[in-house]
Regions:
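Helix-loop-helix hairpin linking two adjacent transmembrane segments in secondary transporters
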Residues: 145-192
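C-terminal transmembrane helical hairpin of 12-TM major facilitator-type secondary transporters
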Residues: 285-329
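Helix-to-loop junctions at the C-terminal end of transmembrane segments
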Residues: 69-81, 270-283, 367
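Cytoplasmic helix-loop-helix junction between adjacent transmembrane helices
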Residues: 113-150
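Structural signature of the two symmetry-related core transmembrane helices
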Residues: 85-98, 178, 285-299, 380
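Intracellular juxtamembrane helix-capping segments at the cytosolic ends
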Residues: 122-134, 324-337
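Conserved MFS/SLC helix-loop-helix module at the cytosolic interface between two early adjacent transmembrane helices
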Residues: 68-106
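Juxtamembrane intracellular "pre-TM" segments in multi-pass secondary transporters
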Residues: 6-14, 193-225
Length: 413
């Protein structure tokens, strides 16, 4: 199916290297806007003369908005030009953040955070652009670069947000993010491709088609299942880690716990490398290697917590393995319909995000109920199931990289 559709995809000018790196930068900024208020939650509560619990509920509108954006906004890049869709999204994101910095009503804060969360899906939109406009033989490489940008955003959002909030106050910190988004909005209009998507399906028809894609397409269904499993594991480990390290015998401060996120730097490097390897050896091999590394690291985390160095090493390998698997897995989704990949990517990311949300809830509660070791064993089991799905499906989970690898082998290359 994917081969036939790929053959019908219209020829477009390849993405220039400078544009790809701008896409990575834009993905980093857009993704980072979900996180900067989290380390400043106490300051926000004091500013609003409210409780941390109430502010936490307002911040919860961000993930809700993000899930809405995955379904409502990401498919737009199949129909309209990336510079138009993403330029507008960054503009609205900038406006929502600017208003967040000046309002004094907690309900309005929640609504604005929801709008910002919806527009912060620009990373998923840019991934879809990579799938549509990158040459087939470089799709994994380009996707790896964009995903590395998303990884930077996940890591930098909390760190930069917390630092700026401490230095200039949380309102000025949000204004800095708003100004950056305004600049990127203008640059998006100037730098991103102007080519319109070839999809003739109406917007409402596209939205109605999303649930059915999972039922009809085996590749999407398998990719979604294993992606949700390992994102469940990823979020459970990091959510559980914060709880475990905050309690005796560790009793680390929030700042000390936050420094463990630096282990996520490995994910940035792994994402970029995994893209190139996916183009060379195929998605399935990269997924299996990534899951093997992540599963072994999760198992080691059951007894590594007493050593900071061992914990950081395990977390670095854990993140690297899962980010590598994510790049390869997403490349199989984008290869299903290269002419209009956004609705497949939107559906995949929705399933993926649901897995992560369940993992966050599980990780925090499980450490309290059954302890750190039992929690991590469950995450390792989830990764093992994802690996078994990949092993058992064979060609059904193959993406464009796997097809190219097979063609090279048949040609004796």
């Amino acid at each position: 199916m994917s081969t036939d559709i790929a053959a019908e995809a219209p020829a477009v000018a390849p993405l220039r290297g400078s544009v790809v790196w701008f896409m990575a930068l834009a993905a980093a900024l857009g993704t980072s806007t979900i996180y900067p208020l989290q380390p400043a939650i106490a300051d926000v509560a004091h500013s609003f003369d409210s409780s941390i619990t109430a502010v936490g509920m307002a911040l919860a509108f961000g993930p809700v908005g993000y899930m809405s954006g995955l379904g409502l906004l990401v498919p737009l890049v199949d129909r309209w030009s990336p510079r138009r869709v993403l330029g507008i999204q960054f503009g609205v994101l900038s406006l929502a953040l600017a208003l967040t910095a000046v309002i004094s009503n907690l309900l309005v804060l929640g609504l604005l955070i929801g709008v910002a969360g919806a527009c912060s899906v620009v990373g998923a939109g840019l991934s879809s652009v990579a799938g549509r406009l990158a040459p087939t033989h470089r799709r994994g490489t380009v996707l790896g670069i964009v995903t590395a940008g998303i990884s930077v955003g996940i890591l930098a959002g909390r760190i930069v947000g917390g630092w700026l909030a401490e230095e200039i106050g949380w309102r000025n910190m949000v204004l800095v993010f708003a100004a950056a988004c305004a600049i990127v909005a203008v640059c998006s209009v100037l730098a991103l491709p102007a080519v319109r998507g070839t999809s003739t399906r109406g917007y409402l028809a596209t939205l109605r088609s999303l649930p059915g894609l999972l039922l009809r397409d085996t590749v999407l269904r398998l990719a979604g299942a294993r992606g949700a499993l390992w994102f469940f594991a990823f979020c459970a480990v990091w959510a559980g880690l914060a709880v475990a390290l905050s309690e005796p015998p560790y009793a680390y401060s929030a700042a000390q716990i936050g420094l463990f996120a630096l282990a996520g730097l490995s994910g940035i490097l792994a994402a970029q490398a995994a893209g190139a390897w996916t183009d060379r050896v195929g998605a399935r091999r990269v997924i299996l290697v990534g899951l093997t590394v992540a599963g072994a690291s999760a198992t080691a985390l059951t007894f590594a917590l007493s050593s900071t160095i061992a914990t950081l090493a395990c977390l670095a390998l854990f993140d690297a393995g899962l980010f590598a698997a994510q790049v390869a897995n997403q490349s199989t989704v984008l290869a299903i319909d290269p002419a209009a990949p956004a609705r497949y990517n939107s559906t995949y990311m929705l399933v993926y995000f649901v897995g992560g949300s369940l993992g966050t809830a599980f990780g925090s509660a499980a450490v309290e109920l059954v302890g750190w070791s039992a929690t991590v064993v469950v995450t390792a089991a989830a990764i093992a199931v994802a690996a078994l799905i990949t092993l058992s499906t064979g060609g059904a989970s193959a993406g464009a990289g796997d097809e190219l690898t097979q063609q090279k082998g048949q040609a004796g290359v």
